[in-house]
Amino acid sequence: MHSPVLLLIDGFNLLSRGYFATSYGKDEAQLPRNEAGYYINALRVFFPKLFQLIREHNVTHVAVAWDVKREDSHRRQAFAFYKASRGELPEALIEQYETATSLLEEIGVAQVTIPPYEADDTIGAFACRWAKEEKGHCFIYSNDRDLLQLLSKSTSQIISSKGKDLIYTEENFRNDYNISPAQWVDVKALLGDKSDNIPGCPGVGEKSALPLIQQYGTIETLYEQIEDLDPKYKRYHKKLVAGEESVIISKELATITTEIEAISSFSLNSLVLTTPADLIIDTLARCGIRVKLAPVQTELKLG
């Protein structure tokens, strides 16, 4: 019996990528629907990918993490500008989110939403608990680079690029960036994130943010030594001083919560998928979705 393997899916990241990849250049009237009249273009990406990952990585435990409503997240409650620039979602995507959650429940795949936390936090708390309890390896499936801060010897991120999946490990990260995954939030604090409306430090870009953290380690150490800044960074001195408050807030926003009480007491047994394969296939087929399954494993039971 091999070691247990946990798969954590960033639900809306996968669903929305599936939606936009298959709806480009089309209006909603052109999108495929099933016999019941429900949109299924994103679902036809979501479910096959879910079960492909389960097959390929010998997954024994799986959870799909969903975000709370944007306005209900603890980050938005603390900072009104967080994600404030994002537009409304297409109705066809919202409908498929509702269909996805119903189907996942019907086929017995665990779903987790814990207000006021975002999916990143839920994933972070599960990954850290899994690592601490030495259960086995954890794979995070998402293209969200914020999650890179969670990489460890027992946690890898699966990133899709050009139709292929890349397993990105802690070793890959250290080789690419010459910092630890935990320092990624410090880089993000300086860079900001336009998609999430995280400000960062105006005037400090990719060419300087990473080298600054490589040299100073954290933004806290950087600001402790701001008046003795290395001469090669002197041109950023005024910008860093002026942007200090923004940088501190940005780090708070970029830091994933890894301690959530509800997850600390969560039964890991509930993440084991025990639904018979034929029932899963038939349930999804009735909705117009085809999937390929490996035999469902039921023998691994954890606390």
From Swiss-Prot:
EC number: 3.1.11.-
Superkingdom field: Bacteria
InterPro entries assigned: 5-3_exonucl_a-hlix_arch_N, 5-3_exonuclease, 5-3_exonuclease_C_sf, DNA_polI_H3TH, FEN, HhH2, PIN-like_dom_sf
GO biological process, one term: DNA replication, Okazaki fragment processing
SMART domains associated with the record: 53EXOc (SM00475), HhH2 (SM00279)
Hydrolase found in the keyword field: yes
Domain 5'-3' exonuclease: 179-262
Gene Ontology MF term list: 5'-3' exonuclease activity; 5'-flap endonuclease activity; DNA binding
Keyword entries, A-Z: DNA-binding, Exonuclease, Hydrolase, Nuclease
Role, per record: 5'-3' exonuclease acting preferentially on double-stranded DNA.
Protein's recorded name: 5'-3' exonuclease
Organism: Halalkalibacterium halodurans (strain ATCC BAA-125 / DSM 18197 / FERM 7344 / JCM 9153 / C-125)
